[in-house]
A protein has these predicted regions:
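Short, small-residue-biased leader/transition segments that mark boundaries at the very start
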Residues: 2-9
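C-terminal beta-signal and terminal closure region of outer-membrane beta-barrel proteins
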Residues: 120-127, 171-196, 297-303, 320, ...
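Transmembrane beta-strands of outer-membrane beta-barrel proteins
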Residues: 15-21, 76, 87-89, 145-147, ...
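Conserved small-residue
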Residues: 118, 124, 137-241, 281, ...
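Solvent-exposed loop/turn elements at secondary-structure boundaries
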Residues: 10-69, 88-123, 162, 166-168, ...
């Protein structure tokens, strides 16, 4: 009689390894009171010395069919601790499906109301979240060094519109694309005489001229490469605003009583909208009617400029395709906080005062931006959001949930000094 014996060797470098699977359903009732009824607002008007009256107008349309938003989520996670606690972290992958999505729907100006709240469709979110914490030095000759990294990525997709259509261009909604996207022309430069397509300028841009904004042409060409039509609304592109990934990195270094903490944040890819450069902004209105900052606009001697030449083809008060000037790469890596502190050793004078511990620290918030294409060009903080993450539609096709930098107060650099006492 023979037998087989197995022996499981312990893996000493693994302390904890845990798998998690979860499923849940939640609802979102983030609807203000009386949204289903609609609202009236007052508007005073003066018809003369004795003709002051107050009128009423519809400020919000009623929606009797407004309902809750529902989300179902699958989570798959891994928790680990390695090397006797020196390294730990989590990894989580999720799939979330949302039905009856609550969004503010933009309406034509002729309706008299800018928007109303509705259940507009279904979305799907897939992504991951990863955190890693490590102790690089653990009181080695008095030195301690710790670091932490968090990383996340999300892919959003609109899977269905309640109307049954494939798109809603007025609200920038397109089935199969992220719900946060813009529908506009894609700027590829400025028209210059050395451009291979300049010979077709009269076809692509009837009445156009050198120095105006050039946008991407998506139409057909004949055998010789000649465009078959002018650039028009059919050339607008669906441009996603989602970043490829985002996260943060922090580190702490301590030596004896001193400690230094640095917290950073980063974002890779995606788009932000600058209302300073967008349509009706302050930097693209070069008609001499407003005082301007120093603008890099096109001239025959400056053909590599960013902005079109003044006095070119206008669209209202803006240069044609002026909205394309407001789209920027939203990538950045910035330092959010630096704190330097000192923990005093327990001494007789502290004991006499009844103080058990004493710590002094100096902290600076938003000290500097390490790298950012938007900051390099404008000097502005790419993380500042003029509107916040509100689900409210606004003019010019910019939704308040979009990352938008505008004329609101910029982020400030703050210096703090503090003392922590424990009695």
């Amino acid at each position: 009689m023979t037998g087989v014996q197995t022996c499981a060797l312990p893996i000493y470098w693994i302390d904890i390894l845990k798998l998690r699977v979860g499923y849940g359903q939640t609802s979102n009732q983030a609807v203000d009171p009386y949204k289903t009824w609609g609202r009236l607002a007052t508007r005073p008007y003066n018809f003369g010395p004795t003709g002051y009256v107050t009128g009423y107008y519809v400020s919000e349309l009623p929606n009797a069919e407004l309902g809750w938003e529902y989300s179902s989520t699958w989570n798959f996670g891994l928790d680990f601790t390695l090397l006797r606690g020196r390294l730990s972290g989590t990894f989580e992958y999720y799939i979330q499906k949302t039905t009856d999505l609550l969004q503010s729907v933009s309406l034509p100006s002729t309706s008299g109301v800018s928007s109303y709240m509705a259940n507009v469709g279904k979305t799907e979110n897939k992504g991951f979240e990863f955190t890693l914490n490590g102790t690089i030095l653990d009181n080695h000759n008095g030195w301690t060094w710790e670091a932490s990294l968090n990383l996340s990525a999300n892919r959003n997709k609109l899977t269905e519109l309640a109307s049954g259509s494939k798109d809603d261009k007025a609200n920038n909604w397109f089935v199969g694309h992220p719900i946060d996207c813009i529908y506009d022309y894609e700027k590829v430069g400025l028209w210059n005489s050395d451009d291979p397509d300049f010979q077709y300028l009269d076809i692509l841009e009837p009445g156009g001229n050198e120095g105006m904004i050039k946008v991407k042409y998506t139409g057909d060409r004949d055998a010789s490469g000649k465009p078959t039509r002018a650039i028009g609304p059919e050339d607008r592109q669906i441009i996603s605003l989602e970043p490829k990934f985002q996260g943060g990195f922090s580190t702490r270094v301590a030596y004896k009583g001193f400690d230094l903490n640095v917290i950073t944040a980063f974002r890779c890819g995606g788009k932000l909208i600058s209302t300073l450069h967008h349509s009706n902004g302050y930097l693209n209105m070069l008609t001499g009617r407003r005082g301007q900052v120093d603008v890099d606009y096109w001239t025959p001697e400056n053909k590599g400029a960013k902005y079109p030449k003044p006095g070119g083809i206008q669209s209202g008060d803006n240069p044609k395709y002026g909205s394309t000037l407001g789209y920027f790469d939203s990538s950045y890596w910035k330092v959010r906080n630096i704190t330097l502190g000192y923990n005093f050793e327990k001494q007789a004078w502290l004991t006499r005062m009844g103080i058990q511990s004493l710590r002094a620290y100096l902290s600076v918030q938003n000290p500097f931006i390490i790298c950012s294409p938007f900051h390099k060009e404008t000097g502005l903080d790419p993380e500042t959001n003029s509107y916040g993450n509100e689900n409210v539609a606004v003019t010019e096709g910019i939704q308040k949930r979009f990352l938008t930098v505008g004329t609101n107060s910029p982020s400030t650099r703050n210096y703090l000094f503090g003392i922590n006492l424990t009695f």
